[in-house]
């Protein structure tokens, strides 16, 4: 975002500002957006092995990824594994496709509030304090002697301090599985039965910690900051079954394709609710949740059918 440089900002304040406003100007030349952003780096390593053991085709994949965000302190580390099996039985009348995937991720999420703070913070001020550097983690902050906290209440907070003094760390986990059976009947090879079962389960949990000595977590007399936990689980299950009959009627130069099936899909989310705690682990008053969790759930059930009739591969009649 285009903003005024420190010299441009000083020039405008010196030209049009009051004496009190001029007195607040600093001597630094800080580009706060340069301070909070960085060049993002990523490594992505994958290993795949495939083959056949006792007539069982298989494929195994392993992955490891690390990535830093363009916003400082934003980063993730992910480990993943995938397995695929594709056996056939009964002289290829029954085909089975099994697929399993899993991932484990460790992330630190940056404080997005620093983006807006970097756009609006005074570019004439330094990143680190030169007066009372032992306070508020050593970051420059706007001070007010008349404020109980020593901080100027309406002023913005140091963008870099907002990033480096907030630890939002989580460990998302996810598992996806699918197995499909496709059976061609021996006594009626034109008829196939297909059963598809699948799931997608994920869990995210973590902590948000803000030091009680940081400007964004400071209160009078200490006992401030944040030390909260969060957790959410999601579960998606699928069952789908259909019969498909396909027959070429050569004497009529036509083809019949009929399918009928059933589908069940369930979505369940569990959000866990917790009280809020200070950085030292003391519970904030009146923060106990009314309910320990809530579980929104949706279920989709479908019956479906389709019939296609083709003549001479030129004329088509379809009903669904």
Task: Label each region the model flagged.
Residues 196, 261, 304-312, 316-320:
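Exposed, low-structure sequence patches enriched in small/polar residues
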Residues 47-51, 83-87, 177-183, 241-245, ...:
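Residues on the lipid-exposed face of transmembrane beta-strands in outer-membrane beta-barrel proteins
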Residues 55-58, 92-96, 188-191, 314-317:
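Repeated loop/turn-to-beta-strand initiation elements of outer-membrane beta-barrel proteins
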Residues 41, 295-299, 307:
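Short secondary-structure boundary/capping elements
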Residues 36-37, 44-66, 70, 82-88, ...:
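Predominantly transmembrane beta-strands of Gram-negative outer membrane beta-barrel pores used
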Residues 1-28, 70-74, 80-176, 194-302:
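Surface-exposed loop/interface segments of Gram-negative outer-membrane beta-barrel transport/assembly proteins
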Residues 29-40:
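Periplasmic N-terminal accessory/gating domains of Gram-negative outer-membrane beta-barrel systems
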């Amino acid at each position: 975002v285009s903003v005024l440089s420190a010299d441009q900002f000083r020039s405008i304040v010196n030209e049009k500002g009051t004496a009190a406003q001029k007195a607040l100007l600093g001597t630094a030349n800080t580009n706060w957006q340069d301070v909070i952003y960085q060049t993002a780096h990523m490594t992505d390593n994958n290993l795949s092995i495939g083959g056949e053991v006792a007539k069982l085709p298989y494929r195994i994949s392993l992955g490891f990824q690390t990535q830093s965000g363009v916003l400082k302190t934003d980063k993730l580390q992910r480990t993943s594994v995938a397995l695929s099996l594709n056996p056939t039985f009964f002289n290829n009348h029954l085909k089975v496709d099994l697929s399993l995937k899993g991932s484990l991720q460790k992330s630190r999420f940056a404080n997005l509030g620093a983006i807006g703070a970097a756009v609006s913070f005074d570019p004439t001020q330094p990143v680190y304090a030169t007066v009372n550097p032992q306070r508020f983690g050593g970051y420059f902050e706007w001070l007010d002697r008349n404020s109980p906290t020593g901080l100027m209440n309406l002023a913005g907070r140091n963008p870099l301090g907002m990033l480096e003094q907030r630890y939002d760390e989580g460990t998302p986990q996810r598992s996806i599985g699918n197995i499909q059976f496709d059976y061609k009947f021996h006594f009626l090879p034109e008829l196939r039965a297909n059963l598809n079962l699948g799931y997608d389960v994920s869990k995210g949990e973590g902590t948000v910690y803000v030091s009680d000595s940081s400007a964004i977590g400071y209160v009078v007399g200490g006992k401030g900051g944040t030390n909260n936990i969060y957790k959410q689980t999601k579960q998606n299950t699928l069952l789908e079954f259909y019969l498909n009959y396909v027959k070429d009627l050569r004497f009529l130069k036509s083809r019949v394709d009929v399918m009928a099936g059933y589908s069940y899909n369930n979505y369940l989310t569990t959000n866990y609710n917790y009280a809020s705690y200070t950085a030292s682990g003391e519970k904030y008053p009146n923060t106990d949740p009314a309910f320990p969790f809530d579980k929104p759930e949706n279920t989709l059930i479908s019956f479906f059918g389709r019939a296609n009739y083709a003549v001479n591969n030129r004329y088509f009649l379809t009903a669904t």
